[in-house]
């Protein structure tokens, strides 16, 4: 329905954005926009290769494996190999829904601040498009940097401090500059969502698996992968959770609470 409106539509997927982080950002946008909020359930595992592909394709991961069987053939759960077809997924979704755009779909992935600044300077040309889909990786980078760099651990030692860090980043970001420019665009509609959030993990748990077991910290898959049932959800039949099978003997485990 949003695409039936006369103005441009911007679909922003902010990678790894938690709801409390959105509330921090939203307080700066209320005076510029009319804000409507809706909620929907995420999928498990709540990780980019599964969740973001599901958003752009309109399919569960098991359906993506069936319709696009080569996607999960590499066995690598990284953003490049697993999420490089997002534009094609969205085009196919619009085609299935019989949505006719007034112009070609524009897809942009912002992976560094410099590219974000370039996009802000190009807003005047982007507003001429009917639908522009934008993936913003800054919040995901913030979450990973929080774990990797001691200085950020000191700056954001708890959730309250993490929200404060989010606020500082957002108010000085190219993303906020983009919002301010779009607020001056007549009839512009912005749909903001996320593929997943983040959890501050404090408790480790032992995992048993072979050398082919995936290396992800919050979920793993492989042949007969095991973990303490108190610490992880064990999925022996991936199809029940609409997950790709990846072979006859593959099972998944997904960490609970703040375990990793």
Question: Where does each model-flagged region fall?
Answer:
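Feature captures the catalytic ectodomains and active-site-proximal regions of enzymes
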Residues: 1-260
């Amino acid at each position: 329905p949003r695409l039936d409106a006369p103005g441009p539509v911007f679909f922003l997927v902010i990678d790894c954005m938690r709801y409390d982080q959105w509330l921090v950002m939203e307080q700066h946008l209320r005076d510029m926009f009319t804000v409507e909020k809706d909620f929907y359930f995420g999928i498990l595992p709540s990780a980019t290769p599964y969740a973001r592909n599901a958003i752009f394709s309109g399919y569960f991961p098991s359906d993506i494996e069936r319709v696009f069987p080569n996607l999960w053939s590499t066995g690598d759960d990284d953003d490049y190999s697993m999420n490089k077809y997002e534009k094609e997924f969205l085009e196919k979704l619009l085609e299935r829904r019989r949505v006719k755009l007034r112009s070609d779909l524009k897809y942009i992935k912002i992976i560094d601040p410099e590219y974000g600044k370039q996009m802000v300077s190009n807003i005047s040309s982007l507003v001429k498009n009917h639908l522009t889909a934008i993936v913003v990786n800054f919040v995901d980078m913030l979450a990973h940097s929080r774990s990797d760099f001691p200085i950020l651990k000191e700056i954001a030692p708890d959730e309250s401090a993490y929200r404060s860090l989010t606020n500082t980043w957002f108010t000085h970001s190219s993303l906020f500059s983009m919002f301010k420019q779009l607020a001056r665009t007549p009839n512009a509609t912005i749909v903001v969502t996320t593929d997943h959030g983040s959890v501050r993990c404090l408790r480790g748990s032992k995992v048993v698996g072979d050398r082919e077991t995936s290396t992800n910290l919050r979920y793993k898959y492989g042949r007969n992968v095991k973990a303490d049932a108190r610490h992880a959800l064990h999925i022996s039949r991936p199809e029940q959770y609409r997950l790709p099978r990846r072979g006859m003997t593959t099972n998944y485990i997904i960490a609970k609470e703040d375990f990793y």
